[in-house]
């Protein structure tokens, strides 16, 4: 998500270290210290303005959540949205999804979420897609054996590409939905900002769940 840079973004994030960190590598191996108590850990890569990760933290107090966003202004907007909620099981990160192995210990994450990622439609940009094989290898390193990944998008091309990429990587599919909002899987679904927008226009939302095999 790209928005115009706001001068207040970095100062706001610096003013709330209890909720936001811009130095995620310093917490490698000790993320649970940022929460009220140790619990299973789930991470959203590319949280945007935070609607999904905040909603998940509210709906699942038994799980600790981390929202990761590379764009400083967008991350700061997510912080503004999260602060009034005062959720003890949520922390936010200004960081790059390509650096998960520098932020998290091997096998420390229970589940990853990729929601409405940039499709990077040009072939020469394939390596930037969050479901490209090098990203999947990075995810496999930090996710627990047998741990899962959930992916939602409105982009049919990216979804089809991701199905192929995950399959070629050897991931095991737990579910594939070509119209999430018209399926039973939509019960309890926490929507993102983009998801609400595209669904209101009648655009089908695609979703997959998959996990890494246990060697």
Swiss-Prot record:
InterPro entries: SAM-dependent_MTases_sf, tRNA_(Gua-N-7)_MeTrfase_Trmb, tRNA_methyltr_TrmB_bact. Pathway: tRNA modification; N(7)-methylguanine-tRNA biosynthesis. Keywords: Methyltransferase, S-adenosyl-L-methionine, Transferase, tRNA processing. It catalyses: guanosine(46) in tRNA + S-adenosyl-L-methionine = N(7)-methylguanosine(46) in tRNA + S-adenosyl-L-homocysteine. S-adenosyl-L-methionine binds at residues 44, 69, 96, 118. One of its GO terms (molecular function) is tRNA (guanine(46)-N7)-methyltransferase activity. Disulfide bonds: none annotated. GO terms for cellular component: tRNA methyltransferase complex. Residues 124-129 are annotated as: Interaction with RNA. It holds the Pfam family Methyltransf_4. The active site is at residue 118. SUPFAM superfamilies: S-adenosyl-L-methionine-dependent methyltransferases. Substrate binds at residues 122, 154, 192-195. Belongs to the class I-like SAM-binding methyltransferase superfamily. TrmB family. Catalyzes the formation of N(7)-methylguanine at position 46 (m7G46) in tRNA. PANTHER family: 3-DEOXY-D-MANNO-OCTULOSONIC-ACID TRANSFERASE/TRNA GUANINE-N 7 - -METHYLTRANSFERASE, PENTACOTRIPEPTIDE-REPEAT REGION OF PRORP DOMAIN-CONTAINING PROTEIN. This is tRNA (guanine-N(7)-)-methyltransferase. The lineage of its organism: Bacteria, Bacillati, Bacillota, Bacilli, Lactobacillales.
């Amino acid at each position: 998500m790209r928005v115009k840079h706001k001068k207040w973004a970095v100062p706001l994030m610096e003013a709330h270290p209890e909720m936001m960190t811009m130095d995620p590598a310093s917490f490698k191996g000790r993320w649970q210290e940022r929460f009220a108590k140790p619990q299973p850990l789930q991470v959203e890569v590319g949280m945007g303005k935070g609607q999904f990760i905040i909603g998940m933290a509210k709906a699942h107090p038994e799980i600790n959540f981390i929202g990761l966003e590379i764009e400083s202004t967008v991350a700061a907007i997510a912080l503004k949205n999260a602060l009034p909620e005062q959720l003890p099981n949520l922390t936010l990160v200004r960081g790059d999804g390509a650096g998960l192995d520098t932020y998290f210990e091997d096998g420390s994450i229970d589940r990853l979420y990729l929601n409405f990622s940039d499709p990077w439609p040009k072939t020469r940009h394939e390596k930037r897609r969050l479901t490209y094989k090098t990203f999947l290898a990075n995810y496999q390193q930090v996710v627990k054996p047998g741990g899962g990944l959930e992916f939602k998008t409105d982009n049919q091309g990216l979804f089809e590409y991701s199905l192929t990429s995950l399959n070629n990587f050897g991931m095991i599919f737990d579910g594939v939905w070509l119209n999430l909002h018209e399926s039973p899987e939509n019960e309890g679904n926490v929507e993102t900002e983009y998801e609400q927008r595209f669904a209101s226009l009648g655009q089908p939302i695609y979703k997959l769940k998959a996990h890494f095999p246990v060697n």
